Each structure stands twice: as structure tokens, then as C-alpha cells.
Amino acid sequence: KALVSEIEKNGLKEEVQVVKTGCFGLCALGPIMIVYPEGTFYSMVKVEDIPEIVEEHLLKGRIVTRLVYQETVTDNGIKSLQDTAFYKKQHRVALRNCGVINPENIDEYIGEGGYQALAKVLTEMTPDDVIQTILDSGLRGRGGGGFPTGMKWKLARNIVKDADQKYVCCNADEGDPGAFMDRSVLEGDPHVVLEAMAIAGYAIGATQGYIYVRAEYPIAVERLEIAIKQAREYG
């Protein structure tokens, strides 16, 4: 709110777009702000820092060095965040959109290829094709057992073929103290969870689903509700 207010105060409302995202990964350095197109990464930003960033960077084009993540500062300017020690060896899959898109905007998810996998599944593949693809991928559960996901789906589809109703249950609860993997996905990219559940439902023959998420994660709950509403509106 402080950033939006300061931007409007300086007459930049039509020139600068503020996009909220999920956690970008360096949680200990939050709150963070990334200014594009150059990708300047400001860390541990306080409300009182906002006027300086807007005036110096957005108006005058001068980076506020004291607030920049120091590893990105070089003699030749600002290097990409992806080249820093924390990120350069990462290959994001489930978290690829977190910190990049606005989790409350379905169009941004679609713009990054969202729901294309579901479209392909529904138009080009049978449920057995989907299950075989998951089996071939070697995808396994994140729990201690590491049970093959494709085998779970195969069992769910075949054991009770004539069931009146099947459900997809998404366990978004963090069982380990201090773990925030599920929370990061739900807060940063909720549509990817809905798309995955829809694909799983098609594969096993389920038409309804439940998501179990902690009440202690109000932002995750709020963004899930927004995502569900948007997905329904888009059909």
C-alpha cells in the first residue's frame, strides 16, 4: 500500500505497475522488491524506504545501493539474480512461477503456460495414457516412502472402477515443524495446484476434490479461494 501510494503521489501511476507475488525464495531477506526491466533486487525493504526508492530509482534512475542485495552488485553494474550463489544451481519445477507471477491473476498463470497440460490431457489423452505418462516420468511422493505417483493413480482408478463418486484429496498441510513447501506453492502459484488436481481427477475418474490447508495460512486460503473462483469463471 505504501508503494502504490508513493507511486501515485509522484505521478507515476500510468508508468509503473506494481505486481504482488508469492515468495521468491530468499525468505530471510524479505520484504523484497524487484524493479524491472533491469531486475534490481531490493531486500529487507521497510515502509520508510519506499519514498527513497521511488524518488531515486523510479524517478531519477539511480539505484539505491544501500538496499540492493549486495551479491548482485558488480563493478559492471547489476548482475542477474539467477547468477547469485543461492539461485544459480537451482532448477525450479513446482516453484517455477513463485515470485514471478501475480498469484491472484489467472491470466498471468495462463501466460506462463498454465492449464495447457490440462487442455492436452482432456483433448489428446485417455486416462490410461495420463497414468502411463506419470509412471514413465518416475514422479514420486514427497513423503518418506517415496511411493510412485503413477502407481497411486493406477490403483485409485482400477481398484473400484464402478464407484459412484471418487475424490482427489490434496494434503496441503505441513507435517514437519518449520516446513513451508506447500505454503509457498499455495501462496505463490495456487492455479498449478488446481490444474494438477484436475489432471489427477481425470486420470482416476474423480469429479470432486478437497484441499486440506491450515487456517494458520490465511494468505494461502485467500489466494486459493480467488484461484478457484477464477478457474470456475474460465470454465
Where are the language model's segments positioned?
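Feature of Fe-S/electron-transfer and energy-metabolism proteins
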Residues: 1-235
